[in-house]
Amino acid sequence: LIVGSDTYPPYIYLNNDGVPAGIDVEIATEAFRRMGYAARFETIDWEQKTNLVESGAIDCIWGCFSMDGREEVYRWAGPYMVSRQVAAVDADSSIRTLGDLAGKTIAVQSTGKPEEIFLSGSDPRIPQTVEVLSIENRSVQYALLSCGYVDAIAAHETGILQYMKDNSVEFRILEEPLLVTGLGIAFAKNDTRGLDS
């Protein structure tokens, strides 16, 4: 089965040998093995994930993928894990709460849950004056924060912690999460193979 994913350490990334590795790779490999399948991982254009799974170019989307708000878009297996979507700032920043983001700039991954949360304007904790910078390549948002080009970033907490560890960078994660979400495996709505069960 072809598993489509973006790189998102520690969930899925290429190890030093260029081979997919990470939490999701281990879980997917074992789950599909138990079902009698071998998993083959392909890095995809994350913005095209729905088109790729619906067209059959990939069998599923698996890679730290939040189920919340997408229940009707895909056929889901999961959740297999719970994750916190959070905002992070420079360690010395005066920003302490989501409300402190008023008039500030935050970088998020395009098509991700944080982008949806910030752009929807539906969360009363988030000021309407936050400027949202949507980035296709997730790793760029970390660099933007490190260099001071943005005031904050938002992503899965585990991903932020992994980036800090791998790059010896000190960010401060805000205490209040944007969202606590279940992570799942997304199949096309018209997929009738029963792989989601």
Residue map of PLM features:
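Periplasmic-binding protein-like
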Residues: 6-7, 81-89, 157, 161, ...
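Extended ligand-binding regions for polar small-molecule ligands
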Residues: 25-35, 92-113, 158-161, 180-197
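Short, well-ordered beta-strand segments
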Residues: 1-6, 88, 105-109, 153, ...
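Short, solvent-exposed loop/turn elements at domain surfaces
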Residues: 9-15, 70, 96-97, 116, ...
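Ligand-binding cleft/hinge of the Venus flytrap
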Residues: 13-17, 28-38, 77, 113-135, ...
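A ligand-binding cleft/hinge motif common to bilobed small-molecule-binding domains
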Residues: 48-54, 62-73, 117-121, 143-179
